[in-house]
């Protein structure tokens, strides 16, 4: 298990590389060029700037999250080939900087969805919150205004250029069925996987968050069967998944440890986080500690150890604690606590295995 930490870049993140360097066991940053619109090539010079900044703090930049997929590709429009070619060129540029994994998603219009970025919790901290009834009754424009109200930081997946054409996008997706979206993903993967393979880069799709349709838009990476289908679209080790325990775990029917065991060799990157589910479909982000939420974090880490996981993992969304002023879900303190909790489980399992091996001799 190789621990990494998401960093949004100098001037775009309240957390410094110097502070991340002080978290035990973190070896690299998970990064992106957030100002480059989907469909444009990432300049090699900009990529190398990030690499240089990271290496000054002894970090690698092996994992990128995300290289966003242009909506024309998801819609299957004739213009998609131009954007796919740009995506291929970005893959080649990233390979020159030593990148090994590209996390991306194939969610129409919206990336992750929450209704409250600062939900007050019982302990006085705040966290990301999803209220199902509000989403069911909300006009999509209202959701955009909720997310856009955070003026301090850019919000990945909620870029202004994407949301400015919201009405047009919704009209375009009226004609896209779930099977159409699968076909468009298949087309995309057939084009980019050979390039990624040649560049020794793994493509790792992120599950839909939350894992069910919203506003009538199709969502296709939501459960065990979907993931199995995804991996067979282009059945090659380069075609993988970013296994996110929080996104998949929002659906109580998803058994993440079982997914880890079945798909182990196709998981180059993992997000581990905890959420507390409610019977009405709501959920709230919690600390990583298993008892604080509904996700079986201990069994998840044990499953990764059991399969000999050597991929990258990062703590995911944390609470906002100790009056930290930070990007929603991405402060320093709670994610650092999460890392130490994950290491504690991992080390405990590893030491237990070592003792078992010694006594068995």
Swiss-Prot record:
Keywords: Iron, Lyase, Manganese. Signal peptide: none annotated. It is an enzyme of class 4 (lyase). The keyword tRNA-binding does not apply. Its cofactor is Fe(2+); Mn(2+). Its EC number is 4.2.1.8. It catalyses: D-mannonate = 2-dehydro-3-deoxy-D-gluconate + H2O. This is Mannonate dehydratase 1. The gene is uxuA1.
